[in-house]
Amino acid sequence: MRPLVLLWGCLVLPGYEALKGPKEISGFEGDTVSLRCTYVEKMKEHRKYWCRQGGILVSRCGDIVYANQDQEVTRGRMSIRDSPQELSMTVIMRDLTLKDSGKYWCGIDRLGRDESFEVTLIVFPGKRDNAVPAGTCCPSSPTPSFQPLTPTRSLQPKAKAWQTQLPEPRSSRPVVWLPLTTPQDSRAVASSVSKPSVSIPMVRMMAPVLILLSLLLAAGLIAFGSHMLRWRKKAWLATETQKNEKVYLETSLPGNGWTTEDSTIDLAVTPECLRNLNPSAVPSPETQNLSQSTEEEEAARSLDDDKEDVMAPPPLQMSAEELAFSEFISV
């Protein structure tokens, strides 16, 4: 958690007073304005630039003008000069137009995050009035005399106002009219004063968010990959187990000479009976076992009888004379 906080601070928080300058400058159409941005000693060797802020959602620089040490660069109506001895750079804008109004950046180019300072330019419509034309001389006039101000108070039904009447000055000096400040202008000036001296561009604010999103995405991909690997390993182990069980069953089957009790065939039955035997007339296994035991007993008895017949002595063979003599004796 601590490295993420440090990363956020490095990306978002700008350098402390590394670059200073005016927050706002103004002028009329056709005028020339200049401003001066100062920087610290360690920024002396870096390249300086002046650009206009652009973009809608993400701030970016446009119309950038770069300047190196002791170099003055002019592009169009803008010029920038870097003075490392004074630790400052000067920006001049000529022939102002209403389109020049907007926000600009006075920045220092360096590796990683740039140091920048936001400046607001306000261009008033119309040209500045010159009371004294060029090439003319004003006649000398006596010291003007002024009358003291006499405030007059006028009451209205629902409001009170103090009105001050200014006497006409008895002088031939030209009159310079200052631009009137409306409530909107006063609010704009107040808001510009209340703004901090250092502004954070949208890119710097979005960079930590993008980095965190990328880290979360990478962590999710790693977790998903590990889950898939475990699932594939389990599936492979299950397949191998099934194969091993199948091989064991095939090797443990009985041989050709092995017969079960249910598969015993009664040898005493003739082939004709087997051919004429209907499937419905096939005896049950218990009946087959009983008939088989009875037939085995009968076969054993017949074998005993055969043995006795073999062991009995053969009959005596007598000749014809002996037979006749025996017949004679018996009579």
From Swiss-Prot:
Q: State which residue ranges cross the membrane.
A: 205-225
Q: Where is the signal peptide?
A: 1-18
Q: Consult the record and explain the modifications the protein receives after translation.
A: O-glycosylated with sialylated oligosaccharides.
Tell me the superkingdom of the source.
Eukaryota
GO cellular component, alphabetical, reads:
apical plasma membrane; basolateral plasma membrane; multivesicular body membrane
User: In this protein, which residues make up the domain named Ig-like V-type?
Assistant: 19-120
Listed as disulfide-bonded, the cysteine pairs are C37-C106
The record's annotation in SMART domains points to: IG (SM00409)
This chain is glycosylated at: T136, S140, T143, S145, T150, T152, S154, T164, T181, T182, S186
Stretches the record annotates as Disordered: 278-318
Q: In terms of one coarse class, where is the protein primarily found?
A: membrane
GO BP, sorted A to Z: immune system process; immunoglobulin transcytosis in epithelial cells
Q: Which residues lie on this side of the membrane: Extracellular?
A: 19-204
Spell out the subcellular localization from the entry. Apical cell membrane; Basolateral cell membrane; Endosome, Multivesicular body membrane
Keywords of this entry: Cell membrane, Disulfide bond, Endosome, Glycoprotein, Immunity, Immunoglobulin domain, Membrane, Receptor, Signal, Transmembrane, Transmembrane helix
List the stretches on the Cytoplasmic face of the membrane. Answer: 226-331
**Gene3D superfamilies, per the entry:** Immunoglobulins (2.60.40.10)
Tissues expressing this chain: Expressed in monocyte cell lines. Expressed in certain types of endothelial and myeloid lineage cells. Expressed in mesenteric lymph nodes (LNs), spleen, thymus, lung, heart and kidney. Expressed in high endothelial venules (HEVs) in peripheral and mesenteric LNs (at protein level). Highly expressed in heart. Slightly expressed in spleen and thymus. Isoform 5 is expressed preferentially in heart. Isoform 1 is expressed predominantly in kidney and liver.
Molecular function (Gene Ontology), one example: IgM binding
Q: Where is the composition biased (Polar residues)?
A: 278-293
Domain comment, as recorded = Ig-like V-type domain mediates binding to lymphocyte.
Family, similarity comment:
Belongs to the CD300 family.
Q: What does this protein do?
A: Receptor which may mediate L-selectin-dependent lymphocyte rollings. Binds SELL in a calcium dependent manner. Binds lymphocyte.
UniProt name for this protein: CMRF35-like molecule 9
From the UniProt record, report the name of the gene that encodes this protein.
Cd300lg
